Amino acid sequence: IGLLGGMSWESTLGYYRAINEGVKEKLGGLHSAKIAMYSVDFAPIEKLQHAGDWEGTAKVLSEAARRIQAAGADFLLICTNTMHKVAPEIEAAVQIPLLHIADATAEVLAHEGIQSVGLLGTAFTMEQDFYKGRLADRHGLQVLVPQEEDRQRVHKVIYQELCLGTIESESKKEYLRIIDVLAAQGAEAVILGCTEIGMLVQQIDTPVRLLDTTAIHAQKAVAHAIGEAHAG
């Protein structure tokens, strides 16, 4: 399993834990996951993101992906929703397949028969088409996002609190309010479309069905790795 992480390292930790737990659960005993991970420095990436220099981020991440491939990974995960904006460039830089986080999430929605879904994430993920467009065009889902003021609040909490490992109860209340608004607008479930959000809000906090993309992406990686190992 190839992991492209560090955006932020806080959420990459969640991937590492979930994948190893998943392998242990499936194979038992002392089994753990075979992982090749490249963890980037998030500060320059975040600067490029907010400057709108996606080409710059694609270059950095494509180089990291090539190193993961060289380390022997059979397939690749980008351990962040937002940087799937440059997934096509990263995919083109390597020969190994990329497991896309939106596709993994859409599979779970299809399995549960959910058609209309709310999306929380960074402003980039909520506003641009690389993620919600893929859910709509490829998977036929109706995607609802919060109104602008709430989008700014969600984005700010991610970068100024969660990426730094800070959990504020006030922010949690705000997120739960925004989730309720999306549900009232017809969302049958809400995608926590940023790998940090699961640190703040969990299923136990709300009756609205939440989809934690870190957990879903990690489960998909485990199933893929074990399937490949058995096929091989």
Model-inferred region functions:
Residues 1-232:
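Non-catalytic structural scaffold of enzyme domains
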